[in-house]
């Protein structure tokens, strides 16, 4: 895929961080009208089916007989566990606080990439990892005093771990599958597991099909999930993966501000301090070592010759 023009890259990045930022308060508000697993299953199913339609012209790249295990594992980690745990967890914690813990994911991904992908671990990255753990500890500390739900914190961490594992798994296996089919099928397959779990443990009749719920459901399904993931893979495919990673810290910031304005969630000192540590951590984890920078310069010079 060709490198995108700077203006288009900036617009796509802005769209992505805004959509994924407002997703948290919107999801929190929608849970007043629906049980969590059914809500997670319905929104991911709609998003997945929309992307299947987009992917159909690339049906020759599917190769389902050879690649179905990749789609299955990715669906379980990135969709069933990630969306399932986060949607249940939003019942226990404010949306802004929950998103701040979930976006500890880039830090966890740094650890898992080092362990399983052999990616380098240098001083700045180690400092970033330590700050990230400290940030989650600061945010979570109030839970041990009874101020916030420990269950909610654990669900947020579980969501972050499943997303980090899923992302590392996609990095390891991504070259063997088509990126659009990967996200379309992982959403569709993952949604089936969520809906089965929802039908088993929840009641479909408990969903209140009100205008606010339908509006939130469609907005999240279309803009946050379907278009959000399409934009994500467009940016990654054009060589902007590092930019996407470095801008992820804006997502919990937008979530916290939006949750404070629309859901009247409090901005506590521990939340702001923990978020600052996590933001700093993400920035440090996404910095490149001198060797990586030198290698990148060498590649660019060769390309220019």
UniProtKB/Swiss-Prot annotation:
It is a multi-pass membrane protein. The keyword Transmembrane applies. It is found in: Cell membrane. Keywords: Cell membrane, Membrane, Repeat, Transmembrane, Transmembrane helix, Transport. Residues 18-141, 161-287 form the EamA domain. GO terms for cellular component: plasma membrane. Pfam families: EamA (PF00892). The chain crosses the membrane at residues 11-31, 37-57, 70-90, 97-117, 126-146, 148-168, 180-200, 217-237, 244-264, 265-285. Signal peptide: none annotated. InterPro entries: AA-Vitamin_Transporters (IPR050638), EamA_dom (IPR000620). Belongs to the EamA transporter family. This is Uncharacterized transporter YvbV. It comes from Bacillus subtilis (strain 168).
């Amino acid at each position: 895929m060709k490198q995108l023009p700077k203006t288009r890259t900036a617009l796509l990045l802005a769209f992505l961080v805004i959509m994924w930022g407002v997703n948290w308060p919107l999801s929190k508000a929608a849970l007043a009208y629906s049980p969590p697993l059914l809500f997670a299953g319905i929104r991911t199913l709609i998003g997945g089916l929309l992307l299947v339609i987009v992917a159909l012209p690339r049906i020759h790249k599917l190769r389902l007989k050879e690649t179905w295990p990749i789609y299955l594992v990715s669906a379980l980690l990135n969709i069933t566990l990630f969306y399932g745990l986060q949607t249940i967890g939003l019942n226990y914690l404010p949306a802004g606080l929950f998103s701040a813990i979930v976006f500890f994911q880039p830090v966890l991904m740094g650890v898992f990439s080092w362990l399983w992908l052999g990616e380098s671990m240098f001083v700045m990255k180690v400092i970033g990892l330590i700050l990230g753990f400290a940030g989650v500890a600061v945010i979570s500390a109030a839970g041990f005093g009874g101020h916030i739900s420990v269950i909610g914190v654990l669900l947020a961490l579980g969501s972050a771990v499943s997303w980090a594992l899923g992302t590392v798994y996609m990095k390891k296996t991504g070259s063997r599958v088509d990126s659009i089919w990967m996200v379309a099928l992982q959403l569709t397959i993952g949604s089936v597991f969520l809906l089965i779990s929802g039908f088993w443990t929840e009641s479909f009749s408990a969903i209140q099909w009100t205008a606010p719920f339908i509006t939130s459901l469609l907005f999240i399904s279309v803009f946050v999930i379907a278009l959000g993931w399409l934009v994500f893979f467009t940016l990654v495919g054009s060589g902007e993966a590092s930019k996407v990673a470095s801008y992820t810290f804006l997502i919990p910031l937008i979530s916290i501000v939006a949750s404070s304005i629309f859901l009247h969630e409090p901005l506590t000192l521990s939340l702001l301090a923990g978020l600052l540590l996590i933001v700093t951590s993400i920035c440090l984890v996404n910095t490149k070592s001198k060797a990586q920078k030198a290698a990148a310069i060498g590649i660019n010079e060769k390309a220019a010759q």
